[in-house]
Amino acid sequence: MRRRYIRLCAKSVRRNEEKMEARKLIETLAVAERLKDATRHCYTSGGRHESVAEHSWRLALMAYLVSDEFPEANLEKLLKMCLIHDIGEAFTGDIPAFDKTSADEGREEALLKEWVQSLPEPFAAEMTALYAEMAARETLEAKIYKALDNIEALIQHNESSLSTWIPLEYDLQMTYGNDKVGFSEYMTALRDMVREDSKAKIAEGK
């Protein structure tokens, strides 16, 4: 009886820890809302800059759509990685990978860490662990997330008008993300297909 009581108490504590108060939720969403206005370098097929929020949403959709290829992966964890991966840009804006310096990365990491630590538990601890796992890129989920993150950007460039590309992107469309897909034949094939689409787009001139 006593053991059962202890288990019930432990469950009650966990439920209390996991509760995010309504006001804190609204404040947290207000930070995330900034990503709707934070534009990325790439354009959409409609001719406007895409937002960080749009990139993150489609990245999460990609993760879901390819999940059958990785039955051993934890889809819930993978989706969380995709959803939170660019929240740091709510504080700094998006800086293209080819322009981002180590100082930029350090500033973003510091601001993000401060914000994450302001969240209630277990969200602060879970997000801290997820960011560390994503940075290490040793787990299957982290590898899938990073490969798709790069590939989503490449696909978006293929969907934009060639007139919006800057000179260095002609090479980046051939090489960007190549080092992130070797863990999976599926990801390698997907990257190859996107590269062929880029070549066809360049040849067509549109």
Language-model regions: role of each:
Residues 14-206:
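Active-site helical microenvironments for divalent-metal-assisted chemistry
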